[in-house]
Amino acid sequence: MKKIILLLLLIACISCQKKEIVDILVVNANVYTVNDTFENAEAFAVKDGKFVEIGNSNNLKLKFKADTIINAQGKTIVPGFIDAHCHFLGLGLNQLNVDLTGTTSFDEVVNRVTDFQNKRQQAFIYGRGWDQNDWDIKEFPNNALLNSLFPNTPVVLERVDGHAILANQAALDLGNVTANSKIDGGEVVLKSGKPTGVLIDKAESLVMQHWPKPTKKELVAALLEAQNICLNYGLTTVDDAGLNQNEIEIIDSLQQAGILNIRVYAMVSATKQNLDYYLNKGIIKTNNLNVRSFKFYADGALGSRGAMLRKPYTDKPGHLGLLVNSIDNLKETAKRIANSAYQMNTHAIGDSANHAVLNTYKKVLQGKPNRRWRVEHAQIVSPEDFKLFQDIVPSIQPTHATSDMYWAEDRVGPKRIKGGYAYKDLLNAYGKVALGTDFPVEEVSPFYTFYAAVARQDLKGYPEKGFQTENALSRKETLKGMTIWAAYSNFEEDEKGSIETGKFADFIILDKDIMTVDVSEIPNIKVVQTFIGGISY
């Protein structure tokens, strides 16, 4: 009898124990924690914006009392997605201008510009998103039609990758661009000895340095619009690849005011002015902003034949591409950054550019371990250069492979294409890959990224057997690349990228299990809820 009484008293004491108060308790979920062992869980508790404990539903319900209880009803939860390379501000600014993405002909481009101007009546017309590779006539356009339609209004239409523009005569006149105009790292495209209006890479600056800069009001509107788009796709951190001081300061002020809630890893544009300022100031780190890297350009893009190759383009004999910055500039900039705590994140697409960047990194980083310098894109890499990624983070964008696969071999030929978009080879070299989209060059959707990485097909299932599937990633590798490995590439793996105790409660609820759903369904997955720091957006 005494034993029974003692047992009842013990049970009563346990039941009377005061539960720990938390803000959120999520139960009955299919949680991919993406921790070191890639454990699954079904519940977790959140307090003060961070994960408190992860485990099973019954145990956590016994231990915690929450202001908000979320019954996930078996839905899948993953860490918030991190886009390791995008143009967040650029996405927002695009919403204020002519959207030319998805156009299938130059006539459609012109029609969109005309419709836009009829509604907006702008003094300067700017658009972005055309790609001649998507047209029946896969050649650069000329500005003749724009000249006739807009004789007095400057028009600049930027190619989807940002590495070429089409400018009408009124815009060319702003920079006094003629057939004799020259600029290192750029090209003024001529036909019959006259400018066509197409300016490639640094030649864009001949016009754009005279173009009106966005106002602070426009920048704020753009950032908030971009945030709305990204949150709907489950992005909780964005790595913006190329920002100036005033733009970073606006981002910081909006975050401090609680208006901009998405977290931003800022790659500072590596201009002399920015280098001087930030190298002197040092790394800037808040919970929402991380300013610790410089974005440098080595070459242009493959689609506009500006990517720098070691041997001429297969479809343009004698042409090697463009070095946007000289090798001397690359080396000098790398030395400056190496003497600081900052990372250097360099755009390199062609095999020549990748070779130069990797060897420069190797030289200046001798005796400086764990600097996590990055190569952005790493699209065409010579076989002997993959080993140089042993200490360099490959920051890659899987949808580039499925967007470029239709014509990439035309550019570089059947031999070089084997070192193209070689994501598995890059993963094997470094042990991690940081995955992004490069939006607005590509679509924002991280589910397109995931699908492109694992299926190596376009949204119509082409090619049937996938594009160079020996370089496909597994679903586990892909999810890591969009979460913990992306966080690692930002020096943020201790605070985000996985669902673990002490980390920011950045997580998303999905309508389908991204790890088991039929691969063809991955692009159609929807985000049910996005949480940043335990707050639903």
Where in this protein do the model-derived segments appear?
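Sec-dependent signal peptide recognition
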Residues: 2-7
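C-terminal motif of bacterial Sec signal peptides marking the signal peptidase cleavage site
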Residues: 12-15
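Divalent metal-binding segments
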Residues: 17-27, 32, 36-277, 296-353, ...
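Secondary-structure transition/capping motifs at alpha-helix termini
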Residues: 254-263, 283-287, 340, 362-372, ...
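Non-cysteine beta-strand/loop elements that form the S-adenosyl-L-methionine
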Residues: 288-306, 392-402
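His/Asp/Glu-enriched, well-ordered alpha-helical/loop segment
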Residues: 335-344, 352-373, 377, 383-385, ...
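Short, Lys/Arg- and Gly-enriched loop/turn segments at beta-strand edges
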Residues: 514-521
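Short peripheral tails and domain-boundary helices/loops at the edges of structured domains
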Residues: 527-537
